[in-house]
Amino acid sequence: MFKQYLQVTKPGIIFGNLISVIGGFLLASKGSIDYPLFIYTLVGVSLVVASGCVFNNYIDRDIDRKMERTKNRVLVKGLISPGVSLVYATLLGIAGFMLLWFGANPLACWLGVMGFVVYVGVYSLYMKRHSVYGTLIGSLSGAAPPVIGYCAVTGDFDSGAAILLAIFSLWQMPHSYAIAIFRFKDYQAANIPVLPVVKGISVAKNHITLYIIAFAVATLMLTLGGYAGYKYLVVAAAVSVWWLGMALRGYKVEDDKVWARKLFGFSIIAITALSIMMSVDFMVPNSQNLLTYVW
């Protein structure tokens, strides 16, 4: 039973979001870590993300039946009743928001609320099923965790928070389109209007390329804005160039699904590398040098 309640929260998504939360938090901390705040923020965001995922599973249980990769989800198989899942999701959300409000700060909590509302209320309930722009809207909620981590420390939505929002929102687009390409038949069967299905894979490849270019520019802004150091800059440039190269090779491949899986896989590597580098390579306030931890 515990396993089923864990599975419905999508632990893989929670883990991925925690990496970005840590990146945002440590970037803002600049080497001076408030450990109780760190724990409250991580647990709070984890609970909010878990709540959103359970609500998403509840909302999507009809279309999940039609998709190969989701047909065995807990709610689809009836291992947890829909009513119980709603109570479970609500309790997780309340606990998460309370931790962010009282353990971090009101701004972190409100950012969590906004990300949650966009994901559950706007994306899951409507945009995912009715608009080709659903992925774009969903990307905003996906970018909330690192911003929450950052603002939990600063208590202020400054240019650093805005840059993080841009980086992670732009990253979501090629990442999500790659999934839609190698899971094309699933999305088609469930009648989900993602870009590759509605406009075609060729158009999706153009969008992927443009979004990776925009992502590359956004990643550089952390250093140019005085938030991250040169080691971060080198890694950001390297992963962006490599990712862009992979995207461009997509115009010549014979098997789009194989290419999309590789692009998706590298997207995970790219965002993890950036999260790690912004955690350890930050600009110290009032310093003339871009300093970092000594490796």
From Swiss-Prot:
Catalysed reaction, written as an equation: heme b + (2E,6E)-farnesyl diphosphate + H2O = Fe(II)-heme o + diphosphate
Gene3D superfamilies: UbiA prenyltransferase
Signal peptide (residue range): none
Location within or outside the cell: Cell inner membrane
Cytoplasmic topology ranges: 1-8, 56-77, 126-196, 247-267
GO molecular function annotation: protoheme IX farnesyltransferase activity
A GO CC term attached to the entry: plasma membrane
Broadest EC class assigned to this enzyme: transferase
Pfam families, alphabetized: UbiA (PF01040)
Keywords: Cell inner membrane, Cell membrane, Heme biosynthesis, Membrane, Transferase, Transmembrane, Transmembrane helix
Job description of the protein: Converts heme B (protoheme IX) to heme O by substitution of the vinyl group on carbon 2 of heme B porphyrin ring with a hydroxyethyl farnesyl side group.
Protein name: Protoheme IX farnesyltransferase
